Structures are given as structure tokens and as C-alpha cells.
């Protein structure tokens, strides 16, 4: 029998040869664990099964008189053609109900009532599916609407609300059967269809506000077209029109006109291309160089505060600031106020009432309006996972905290809303999502512990759903104590927890043998059943379950050895081993009152069977389940059970391997690639600096050319203006490299912390750390961490050496640029030649000297190529002769470039005697200047 998909025909075949109570008990246990395939159920098969059921003992009478409920409660629709299968089953159940008489005191779970609700649900879903398939998208997005925009949006809103009200009414109409597995599957699929429908009708008009300015509107158009293309095709023309209508004289306030490489600028590179190409569908294929949208605080002049999440580069910029100016701090204070408003008004639930589906969908609108969906939340998550807080500024710290809470909450919200339904199916999925995200967030570092606490509370309250005691009283109305116990245990197994006790007294109908055996004999029987190769050997213990010591002996001699064997298997081995399955059957059959143990064993089996890719969330849940199993056993036996660790260790190592492959490895590959690219650039920059350091440069005063030599060999020539430009360029590159090289140090810190966090989190599992395999894994991770630290440090040491060498040249270049700037025409005009010469001379005199780089002959060719690529070649010029009193042209002396202030430039002694006539009042000067004018006038 296939335990994952029970066929009704196979069940009936087993009953052809044996219809004993024990056989029925085993079969019903398997049905309740694995469920029947709904497509295999017919009225005739149900009728045959019901007629064979014993009237008394166990819960057989309940099944017989509530067959419709039992079938819906323990059958599954599978994964294909679900609604069609449900319709067919409804018809078969109607036929069965007409042909089989039953008696029931349960007001809400009798065959007639359950069938009525099931029929009504099927009919409602048929109508609702037709409405969802209506062309609402086309209706509301026609190019020639007869409505104005506000009316159009209100019509759309009314249609959405009408449909959401219908689905709420639909669920209320099937309140008493919504916890049946088959019904829950139908509801779950319906809600997911509604969610997809809702997302397909999302448009730009839903998030635009009257006070949005030019940049706000373009960013929102880009958001809508990028993530909701099908419903926003009209933006292809609107985007272009919006740009054409903007008076765009000077783009510099918006854009970095000559951008240099920066991660924050790259976030908006595609968007910038779309603006300059006026094409919202443009793709960035690195074919063009164009200005990039600014990412610093100045962009807030054009970007509304509530739209900052649309600008990913700006968020990145804030996260990576370590200090801010007073003006920026004031702006950041307003941003923090906005973030706090988002947390309080959008994310936190206002009251204790269970949130409705329309309210959850409304939160999608609010998150979209500020630029958040699951894709953008992932982009921001990536920023946070590679971010290390390095600021003591309170406002920057507040921004990090609030931003993290919003992003993690929004991301998990979108993960949940995609799967949401008011059923136990979603409730269990939500627990898995939260555990998985908790594991991922906490491994990022201690700074996220408080953040996770807030996020967990927000999400848990948004999607809170459970079975209340009031609902259970309604659900079980008319049931006797035994039936209430059966229904309570069923809900417990589905929801995993019920927050109210079952307080009813139990008088369980029994039919047991009169056999009486000693405790020693019972121990031997349990040992024999455990060691037997027959899967159903445990059934031989059924006659002894009334023995006063049965529970203790059965757990000690059957359950504990079975768990020791199971926990000694690896995760892969346990999937192929049936021992866990046999243990579940045995516990459910022999200890029916201890439903918690059966429930946790069943959960353990479900997770090990259904999980194909283990992650930290799965491990966290399975680890918690195993601890509850062990705690339950310890509580029942008042002993301490110490399980084997192979199963959990293999699961943990698999989970961490997946975590590292999913999160750490891609980050390492991306970071190393970026670091290598950066190092290559810096090496090239260092080669340029080294080549220049190896030269002796002379200024030719005749044509203002700078001639460069390696020793006595001339290797190049460039104009003074080109030399000046190159000096300035290298100085700017040096500044940029100083900031960019910090990324390597940050990468080192982040990488080492990632590995250390892995070790730190593993060692938290005190019950597993003694396992040798786990110890070996920890040693390997620590070795990787040590090796990475050494490698990074070697690279950083090399960078420091290059930096020391490069800065000698850069400092000289700074002085050269300063001297040239001091002596430029503008400064001489403003401050006089004398003062500027004195200033330049002071600088030259205090210039420190350094040893010139000695170059071996075989390196000259190599260095020359770098030098030629660095400096523009001197263009041919007309030789300008100096005007001397002597005949002929004297030899032009080449003077070292840095030695421009030699004797020839020494100031003339008592220069004021020669200049006094124009810098001070003199009668002689006045007479010389005015006399010719007076003569002409006369």
C-alpha cells in the first residue's frame, strides 16, 4: 500500500480477508494519518466500507454515523484538477447519503448538514471562479475610458470589495467543515486564486498621489512596469510623455553627469538609462555611458520623503554612511519619522480581532504605495545581509533598526500572503516560514536579535489564526465525551496546538482480552515486537494495553529503542527506513490517549518525507519536534531519554551546507569578483604611479613640454597642460581608490563574521555538539575562516605597500597642481604676481625629497608602455625664439620640472625702485602720464 496516497480500493481489498476490530483499527489509523485519494472514492465503496465497520469499540460508531464528515476530513484532492475531483466527490456523497441511513446527535457534523455545506461551497466556488475570470483588467485599463480617473479607481475598488465580501461570506457558510482536510484544500486553493487575481489588476494609478512630483512619478512608473508589466502596458507611452512634458534644461541637479563607479549609483543605472532613452522597457547592457541618478541627500530636493523606497541607491547610501552633516541629520530625522509611521500604521495590527482577508490585501496596496513588494524587499534584504553597522550616530542607528524591521516584516508578509488562507494548511506553512526566516536573520549577527523579536510579533499578529474554545463548542455541539475527544485530537493534530484544554470526563468504550501477564512477560513481548521483522508485530500487544504498567513498559522496551534506532540514521537513510512509520502506527494504536506523542511523531514523518531541500528553517522545526517527542517520553516515564544524534546532525549539516550554498557562496563569488576587479584596477593604477616615480621630468621652457626620462633615456613627452590634467586625474583616482579599497576590508570582516556566526549558531545546540561529525565540520569552518583571514590580510598588506608608494607620487602631484594653480592667470590677477610667486616658493622649499625609483634596464620597456598610455604625447609646435640682446639663438637649457624657482627667478633687489612709479604716487609719474594729454587738449 502506498502510504502517501491511500486508494479506497486497496483498503477494501484488505478487508475482504479480515474484518476484525484490530484490522479496522489499523486501517483507520492509516487513513487518519495519510488520507484517502479523493479521486478513488465512490458511493459504492463508501457504502461497502460503512457496512463492514463494527458498531462498537473505539471510534467506529462515530465513523459509521458521520461517514460524509469522515470522508471529507480524511481525504485529499491531490495536486491536479482539484475542483473537478471535488465536484465528482460531492455527487458520490449525495448518492451515498440517499442510500445509507445514519443516526447522529451532532448538530453541525451530521451527514445531512455536512453535505449541505459541501454542496453550497461547491456552488459558490463555481460562481466565484467565473467572476474572477471576468475581464476586469481590460475593463479598468481601456485606453479610451468614459470615466475620469477618480471614478475609474472607485469602480475598480467597488468590484474588488464586492468579490472579497463574497469570499468572506463563502467561508462563513462552511464554518463547521472548514477544518476537514478536503475542504481546507479547496479553500486554500481559492484564496490563492484570489490573491493572484488581485495582483494581476494592480496598476500605476493605484499608487500615484496628487502631490507626486516628476521624479516620484517616473520611479513609480518604473516600479509598476518592472514588476507588473501585463497590467501596466499603458506606461510605455505615458513614461515618454511625462519626460517630454518636463522642462529639463539642466540634468545636473538630478544626475551625476560624470559618474565614477559606485555600488549605490549602480542600483539606479537601468532607471537612469530609461530616462535618457525615454524608454521604460530599456535594458542596461553596458553599451552606453550616461549620467546616473544621484543617490545622496541632495536628491530629496526632487524626491518625496514617502517615496524613498523606490530609490534603492539612496537607501544604500544611507546604510553605508558612518557620519552625517547637521543638515543631513535633520533630513534623516524626518525619514526616521516616516519609517516609524510605516511600522505603526501599516505593519502593526491595531486591535485583538482576527484580521480579515480584505484587510491583508489592503496592506499590499499600502506597501506598494511606498515601493515595497517581494522583489524589492529581496533587494533591500541583500543590502542588509552584506551590511555591518559601523556608526555611533543615533539617527543612523535608528534608521538601520526601523528600516530592518520594515524590510524583514514586509518580506515575510509577502511570503505569507501568497500562501494565505484561513485554514490549518496555511497555519502550518506560516510556522515553517517564520522558523526559516528566523534562522536566516539570526545568523546575520547579534544586532538582528531585537529586530527579529519585533518582526516575529508583527507577522504573527497579522496572520494569527487558531481554534478557539468557543469554536470547538460550536463544532462539537451534541457530541458525547468520546466524540469530543476524537474531534479535539483531530484538531490538535491539524493545528499543532490548541490553547484550551479538553476538560470533559472520558468513559472510553473498550473490548479487551482477559489475559493477565506479569510485567516481565510484557517486557519480553515488547522486546520481541521491537526485534521482529514483521511490520505489524506491534499489533500482538493490543490485548495487553489495559495492563497497569503497559504504558511505561511499552515506551521503555519498544518506543525508546525504536527512537534510538531512528535518531541514529542520517536524514537520507530515515527517508527509506519504515521504522518511524511503524512507530507511528504502534503509538496511535496502542496509546490512543497520548495523542501528543502520535502527533509529533507524525509531524516528524511528514517533514522527513516531504522535504526535498533542507534549509535552516526545516532543521529548526524538526529539531523542535524531536525535542517535544523526547520531552513527552520523559514526562510519561519520569526518566531521561538520551537519543542518538546522527539524524539531527546530518540534518543540521545539510541545512548549513544549503545555507552556505544559497547565501554565503553567491556572496563570496560576487564579492571576490568585485574585489578582484577592484584590485586589477588598483594594480593598473599602481603601475602608472610606479612608472611615473621611475622618471625624471624636465620642463622645456621654450614650448612648455614636459620631457620624461628613465635615467638618460628619453621615454616620453607631453604638454604642460596635459601633464597638469594627468596629475589632477591621478589625484582624483587616488581619492576614489581610498574609499573603494575600504570595501575589501569590509568584505573581509563580513566574510569572517559569516563563518564565525555559523560556528556560533551550531554550538548553541548543546545536545548535538558532542557528535564527532559535527565537531569535524566546525573544525573545517574554522580552518576556512583562518585561511580566509590570512589571505585577506596578505592582500591588505600588499595594498598598504602599494598605497605607501603611490602616495609619494600623489603628494608630489598635489604640490605640482597647487603650484600651477597658484601661478595661474586668475590668481595672479587677483593677488599679484609677487604674492603668488612667494607662495609657490614657500611650497617648493618645504617639499620633502624621496629616493627616486631605480629601474633596471629590462623593466624600461614595461614601464614605458604604462607611461605612454598615461600621458598624452606632445603635439608638434612652432619653436618660439627668446628675445635676447645677443645675436643668434642661445642653447635652450632643460631645467628639472620641480626646480623652476632657480636663480633666474630670484626677485630683483630693491625692486620697489623700479616699480615705484606705478604702485605709489609720484609727481614725475603724473607728469609723464598727464602731460601728453594736456598738450593735445591745448
Curated annotation (Swiss-Prot):
Pfam families in the record: Herpes_U30
Subcellular location: Virion tegument; Host cytoplasm; Host nucleus; Host Golgi apparatus, Host trans-Golgi network
Record bears the keyword RNA-binding: no
InterPro entries: Herpes_U30, HSV_ITP
Signal peptide: none
Domain of life: Viruses
Principal location: virion
Keyword 4Fe-4S applies: no
GO cellular component, one term: host cell Golgi apparatus
Region (Interaction with large tegument protein): 457-938
Swiss-Prot/TrEMBL keywords: Host cytoplasm, Host Golgi apparatus, Host nucleus, Virion, Virion tegument
Any one GO biological process: virion assembly
Record-stated family: Belongs to the herpesviridae inner tegument protein family.
Quaternary context: Interacts (via C-terminus) with the large tegument protein/LTP (via N-terminus).
General function of this protein: Plays an essential role in cytoplasmic secondary envelopment during viral egress. Interacts with the capsid via the large tegument protein/LTP and participates in its transport to the host trans-Golgi network (TGN) where secondary envelopment occurs. Modulates tegumentation and capsid accumulation at the viral assembly complex.
HAMAP family: HSV_ITP
Name of the protein described by the UniProt record: Inner tegument protein
Source organism: Human herpesvirus 7 (strain JI)
